[in-house]
Amino acid sequence: MASQRLAPRKSSAAHKSHRKPKRSWNVYVSRSLKAINSHMSMSGRTMKIVNSYVNDVMERIAMEAASIVRAHKKLTLGAREVQTAVRLVLPPELAKHAMAEGTKAVSNSCR
């Protein structure tokens, strides 16, 4: 009887599909809340709502910045386009604070 050679079996770990972890703003929202008031917390449902809201605002800013880049026939999305998009998407007072915080964050990261 001739012996049959079987193909080596792959490990079961190789067959498992890997899901990307869902990115969320939960950590940053809870840190901001603790910085404001250390005794407060958020329920899971509230955190999902805030996370959804932040994702929506970020997506709107990204879409607006991309349309600005296309309108100016450029290939690179820079800080200036993002600033313009923030001014267009957010209400004036909130945009002013966002611009100040964004400028501060960029200057701190460039040190």
Curated annotation (Swiss-Prot):
It is found in: Nucleus; Chromosome. Gene3D superfamilies: Histone, subunit A (1.10.20.10). CDD domains: HFD_H2B. Its main location: nucleus. One of its GO terms (molecular function) is protein heterodimerization activity. InterPro entries: Histone-fold (IPR009072), Histone_H2A/H2B/H3 (IPR007125), Histone_H2B (IPR000558), HISTONE_H2B_site (IPR055333). Residues 12-23 have a biased composition (Basic residues). SMART domains: H2B (SM00427). GO terms for cellular component: nucleosome; nucleus. Keywords: Chromosome, DNA-binding, Nucleosome core, Nucleus. Residues 1-24 are annotated as: Disordered. Core component of nucleosome. Nucleosomes wrap and compact DNA into chromatin, limiting DNA accessibility to the cellular machineries which require DNA as a template. Histones thereby play a central role in transcription regulation, DNA repair, DNA replication and chromosomal stability. DNA accessibility is regulated via a complex set of post-translational modifications of histones, also called histone code, and nucleosome remodeling. Belongs to the histone H2B family. This is Histone H2B. It comes from Leishmania enriettii.
